[in-house]
Amino acid sequence: RCLSRGLGDVYKRQAVDGVEPQSETNWRLADNYKVPRIGFVNKMDRQGSNFLGVCKQVIEKLGSKAVPIVLNIGDEEDFKGIVDLVKNQAIVWHDENYGSTFDIVDIPDDLKEEAERLRGELIEAVAEYDENLLEKYFEDPDSITEDEVHNALRLSLIHISEPTRQAS
């Protein structure tokens, strides 16, 4: 009943467990009421965590367009930050204070190619609902601003269903 009155919903999944059976039931209900959703994958620092694997499960099991808006830097106990695909920069947390402080840095070289691919997928997905952004994407994708991506993300939220981010 609450779902029919809601403006949106956050679906939390564990990076190790992925999509669980109760998620499928709740997802179908949200589909019925056309509730926009944002996904959140937590426990990225656990053994066996797989952010992109969880996104793939959401696509395969729930039929959603799970669009990552971040990419993890490191896996399991080496999880130390994220690449923000909207801002096109990396955020690395400091271990000594359990991540309450961080540095904003360039995207690590070993993640640049994957970050570029995922950013392209994100922009393509949201550009379906913003013709100006779509044109700009094909003409000069490097000129797309953070604000343009945020605005298109807002417009497309109900259609994409689940922009997805992560944490430990």
Model-identified regions with their sequence ranges:
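Conserved Switch II/interswitch segment of TRAFAC-class P-loop GTPases
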Residues: 9-24, 31, 35-52
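Alpha-helical scaffold elements adjacent to nucleotide-binding pockets in ATP/GTP-utilizing enzyme cores
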Residues: 22-29, 40, 50-61, 81-85, ...
